[in-house]
């Protein structure tokens, strides 16, 4: 099977790639190496800078690189924000992947709309980033995550991908 793993957190996709290759699958891992952790990958998607000119150059690099991401049997996204871009700029890359590949799966790794929502209900998890027991935790980081993932573009992108991709994949042992 031809498999594309896009993005990485905590070496999850790098480790998965090793296991899938050992089983005889053809696997390509494209990521930024989880930024400073610099995990191994086949195709480097590291963004060198947030400046205007480097961002334009990076965007052009992505356009060229994504031409290679066609005709895979399976594409797994680490998270809705599988590229180091604003959510609204990721959307066309996601649609490209859907058009040119057999199945696209969304991994439930890292922060996302559903994790924030579940943490705030104070029922799904006894403890999370957002709650301790039945009390919501207040912090600056949480306020940013709530704004971005429940009401912002990240949340909109997350819901769109979740509604039209193949089934969402939770981390091993959590689903």
Feature-to-residue mapping (PLM):
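Glycine-rich, highly charged phosphate/nucleotide-binding loops
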Residues: 48-68
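Short N-terminal targeting/anchoring amphipathic segment
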Residues: 2-6, 66-89, 103-107, 168
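Active-site proximal beta-strand in glycosyltransferases
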Residues: 30, 74-76, 94-139
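Membrane-proximal helix-turn-helix segments that form the acceptor-binding/catalytic region
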Residues: 63-70, 92-99, 128-166
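Short catalytic/ligand-binding loop motif for oxyanion handling, primarily in non-cytosolic enzymes
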Residues: 12-14, 36-40, 83-86, 112-117, ...
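N-terminal subdomain of nucleotide-sugar transferases
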Residues: 1-43, 99-101
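Active-site regions of enzymes building and remodeling cell-envelope glycoconjugates
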Residues: 40-51, 175
């Amino acid at each position: 099977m031809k498999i594309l793993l896009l993005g990485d957190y905590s070496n999850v996709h790098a480790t998965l790639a090793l296991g899938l290759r050992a089983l005889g699958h053809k696997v390509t891992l494209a990521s930024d190496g989880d930024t400073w952790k610099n995990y191994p990958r086949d195709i480097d998607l590291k963004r060198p800078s947030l400046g205007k000119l480097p961002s334009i150059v990076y965007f052009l690099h992505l356009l060229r690189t994504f031409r290679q991401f066609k005709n895979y049997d399976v594409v797994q996204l680490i998270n809705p924000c599988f590229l180091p871009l604003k959510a609204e700029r990721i959307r066309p890359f996601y649609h490209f992947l859907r058009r040119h590949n057999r199945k696209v799966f969304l991994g439930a790794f890292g922060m996302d709309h559903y994790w924030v929502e579940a943490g705030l209900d104070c029922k799904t998890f006894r403890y999370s980033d957002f709650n301790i027991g039945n009390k919501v935790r207040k912090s600056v980081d949480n306020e940013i995550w709530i704004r971005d993932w429940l009401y912002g573009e990240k949340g909109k992108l997350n819901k769109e991908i979740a509604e039209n991709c193949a089934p969402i994949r939770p981390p091993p042992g959590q689903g």
